[in-house]
Amino acid sequence: MAENFSFDVVSDFDRQELVNALDQVKREISQRYDLKGTETILELEKENIFITTNSELTLNSVIDIIRQKAIKRKLSLKIFEYKSIEAVSGNKVKQTITLKKGLNQEIAKKISKNLRDEIKKINVSINGETLRVMSKSKNDLQLAIKLLENLEETYKIPLQANNYR
């Protein structure tokens, strides 16, 4: 049994689910009594969500709705990185939410080191924004997946195990 088993570790999210969640947020903003007439604008660009509204209270309500809809769509809340609130013209406030996607080299190296320190019989290689974890034992790979769940909390990034072979 010289066959190696492997899986890939990625930090990703389903963009279409995010688009659907934000569409639901826009619909709820237009229908909720406390948010009607607040001139709230919600924009999604490649790696950012921009929220512009008339008060911080409304902004906090919109952020809560975004979180609720993201959870219902099975999106991790760790993909959202909240920037500071800015005052913009016309007595409005704006917040930028950056979307985290991909593993940078520094975090990939730390995760790789943690996995190798805990489980001696695995090989970990970094391929761009993906980690490939290989072992001759499926049990070691399952232990690595369990360890990834703990590392997700440590590094505050969403991690998924894909292509389990």
From Swiss-Prot:
Role summary: Nucleotide-binding protein.
Keyword Glycoprotein: no
Keyword Nucleotide-binding in record: yes
Annotated family: Belongs to the YajQ family.
Keywords: Nucleotide-binding
Pfam families documented for this protein: DUF520 (PF04461)
A single cellular component GO annotation: cytosol
Stretch forming the signal peptide: none
Organism listed in the record: Prochlorococcus marinus (strain MIT 9515)
UniProt-listed InterPro entries: DUF520, UPF0234-like_C, UPF0234_N, YajQ-like_sf
GO terms, molecular function: nucleotide binding
Protein name: Nucleotide-binding protein P9515_05441
Superkingdom, natural source: Bacteria
